[in-house]
UniProtKB/Swiss-Prot annotation:
Subcellular localization(s) per the UniProt record: Cytoplasm
Organism: Staphylococcus saprophyticus subsp. saprophyticus (strain ATCC 15305 / DSM 20229 / NCIMB 8711 / NCTC 7292 / S-41)
Catalytic reactions of this protein: Endonucleolytic cleavage at a junction such as a reciprocal single-stranded crossover between two homologous DNA duplexes (Holliday junction)
Cofactor note: Binds 1 Mg(2+) ion per subunit.
Binding annotation for Mg(2+): 87, 89, 102, 121
Entry protein name: Holliday junction resolvase RecU
Length: 208
């Protein structure tokens, strides 16, 4: 088959028939150059507009250093710095359940470096988990164009291993074994709540 300009049509084999761990989807739309944050933003808008869930990205805290007051009723910030977030990236409500999660991307092909996480973030995740919150990480391997949901309950052992200076990263294979693969699709782009449903079911069985 040819395009109207006479050039041949070449099928992108990397995006057709792609499956993973038993996935049967015939089409994988792929990241298409977007960041994980943008994919989540588009998905959250989809969930919100259809009354499925209310999930938002937490604003990054800012440390104001210098303020100028040209008028009594006005203030101009001349200097400010982004502070290290004290909690996770996202939180919200889904079917009456509190969700709290961190989103991370890595260019590494074989592992996820744990120095991307901060101890205060992990403490926050632990506190939410102890209150029966649904807590997890969304990890994207950019070079592989693969996204995984890693439950906090499974992440804990890797973090403890990191603290003990046994191993400073989590391999792709460990994440595949302990997490859930999330395929890209048309709408929402990253339907991670479908995977959250599986996580809630699995954790409810584990906690019984």
């Amino acid at each position: 088959m040819n395009y109207p300009n006479g050039k041949p049509f070449n099928r992108n084999k990397s995006q057709v028939g792609r499956t993973h761990k038993g996935q049967t989807s015939k089409i994988d739309y792929g990241g298409r150059g977007m960041s994980l944050e943008k994919d989540i933003e588009l998905s959250n808008d989809y969930y919100l507009n259809r009354g499925i869930a209310v999930i938002h990205k937490k604003p990054t805290p800012i440390q104001i250093v210098n303020v100028h007051y040209p008028m009594r009723s006005k203030a101009v910030i001349n200097e400010a710095y982004f502070r290290t977030p004290s909690t996770t990236d996202y939180n919200g409500i889904y079917h009456g359940r509190y969700l709290d999660f961190e989103a991370k991307e890595t260019k590494n092909k074989t592992s996820f470096p744990l120095n991307n996480m901060h101890e205060h973030q992990v403490r926050h995740m632990e506190a939410c988990y102890q209150q029966q919150g649904v807590v997890f990480l969304l990890i994207r391997f950019k070079s592989l164009d693969e996204v995984y949901l890693l439950p906090y309950a499974n992440f804990k052992k890797f973090w403890e291993r990191h603290i003990q200076e046994i191993k400073k990263s989590v391999t792709v294979e460990e994440i595949r074994k302990n997490g859930y693969y999330i395929p890209y699709q048309y709408q929402p782009r990253l339907n991670y709540l479908k995977t959250v449903d599986k996580l809630i079911l699995d954790e409810s069985e584990d906690r019984v």
